[in-house]
Amino acid sequence: EQEIRSFGNKGAVLAADILDYMIRRYADGGEDALMHDALAAAAAVCPQCLVCHDYFVDVECQGEYTAGHTMVDRRGRTGKKPNVSVAMELDLPVFKQWLKDCLKQCG
C-alpha cells in the first residue's frame, strides 16, 4: 500500500512490502490479503477492532466427532456455558487506522 510506504520509515516500508506480496499471493484466489500477525497484535492491544461473541469451545481429542479439531458451539447445542470470547468480525476501518498509527511510529 502506497500510503504505508509513504511513511518512509523502515518498519512501514517492510510492512508495505509484505502487504504487496500478500495482495499478489491472494489475487488469484479471490481472497483479500490476510494479515494474521497484525490481527493477533490488534486483538491484544486494540480490542475495539473486533466484534466478539461468547461460545463454548473445546478441542475434541477422542475422535468421537473430529480428530483434534477445535469445536465451537455457535448454536448452543451442547447446553454448556460459554467459556471463550471468539472474534467473529473485524471493524476494518478501525483496524486499518490502528495499523497505520503503529507503522507511523516505527523507526
Name each model-derived stretch.
Residues 1-107:
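Conformational coupling and interaction surfaces
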